[in-house]
Amino acid sequence: QNIEVRHVKTYAANKAPSNSALGSITLEMSNSMVLLPKIPMKRRYFDERVGWFARGQTDYGLKDQRSKTVKYLDRYRLEVKDEDIEKFKRGELVEPKKQIVYYVDRATPKEWVPYIIQGVNDWQVAFEAAGFKNAIIGKMAPTAEEDPEYSPEDVRYSVIRYLASPIPNANGPHVSDPRSGEILESDI
């Protein structure tokens, strides 16, 4: 499904946080290459009235020899299980084919973990309004013993990471399928 590449790079740097004695900075980086879904989701046009992530693409194939930027919505693939389609049509809550799972970084202070997990799970109400139960869950990231394949750098896992910082904010970048806007992974 994916390839993970980790590497250490050293660059010339004259300003902090460089090593002033050597004039360099060394960074450990991780890159993921992921196989996209065989069947892309149907694209949905972005609506300015809805505050959400969008992807702009330039269409050069217009007949009048001009280009046009089109915005598409980035979103999760929430699909009804085949056996639950009739229930869904009747307005009953159903579980999606694939849950949205956010793993909480094991470096997170222990006293905060239950609240972070509850914060993720509090989104259940929004997904229930769309007809899905248990669509999103928060859980503690597995240990190496529990899942030797798990890595917070791996593009297959959405992670809420703890990074001590004096800056009081959070960031939520995500990886999405450029063909459809399907969110494949997100980190907070």
Where are these regions (language model features)?
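Alpha-helix N-cap/helix-initiation motif
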Residues: 109-113
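Solvent-exposed, polar/charged alpha-helical surfaces in well-ordered, non-transmembrane soluble domains
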Residues: 114-121, 125
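Auxiliary tRNA-acceptor-end handling modules of aminoacyl-tRNA synthetases
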Residues: 1-108, 126, 130, 135, ...
